[in-house]
UniProtKB/Swiss-Prot annotation:
Species, as recorded: Lactobacillus delbrueckii subsp. bulgaricus (strain ATCC 11842 / DSM 20081 / BCRC 10696 / JCM 1002 / NBRC 13953 / NCIMB 11778 / NCTC 12712 / WDCM 00102 / Lb 14)
Gene3D superfamilies, A to Z: Nucleic acid-binding proteins (2.40.50.140)
Lineage: Bacteria, Bacillati, Bacillota, Bacilli, Lactobacillales
Function: One of the primary rRNA binding proteins, it binds specifically to the 5'-end of 16S ribosomal RNA.
Highest taxon above the source species: Bacteria
Any Gene Ontology CC annotation: cytosolic small ribosomal subunit
This protein's name: Small ribosomal subunit protein uS17
Subunit and interaction comment: Part of the 30S ribosomal subunit.
Keywords from the UniProt entry: Ribonucleoprotein, Ribosomal protein, RNA-binding, rRNA-binding
Length: 88
């Protein structure tokens, strides 16, 4: 029972699409904050994730939610869950 619950706990991130030039693939930038261990100042850093977009729905500038999944290629480890906000 606990093994199946542990398996389904996957990371879900929300970020901004910065590239949709590849077929069925988007690049999402996720901004997060980290506290400095000594000075306790919050610093912002970002990381890019490649995600599977099966229907090519997401466009550059959209705010999307992505979920961790099995490896789909050499770099893709996430898939598109939904589009939170469309760009103008």
């Amino acid at each position: 029972m606990s093994e199946s619950i542990e398996r389904n706990r996957r990371h879900v991130y929300q970020g901004r699409v910065v590239s949709d030039k590849m077929d069925k693939t988007i690049v999402v930038v996720v901004d997060t904050y980290k506290n400095h261990p000594v000075y306790s100042k919050r610093t912002r850093y970002s990381k890019k994730y490649y995600a599977m977009d099966e229907n090519n729905e997401a466009k550059v500038g959209d705010i999307v939610r992505i979920m961790e999944t099995r490896p789909l290629s050499r770099t893709k480890r996430f898939r598109l869950v939904d589009i939170v906000k469309k760009s103008v």
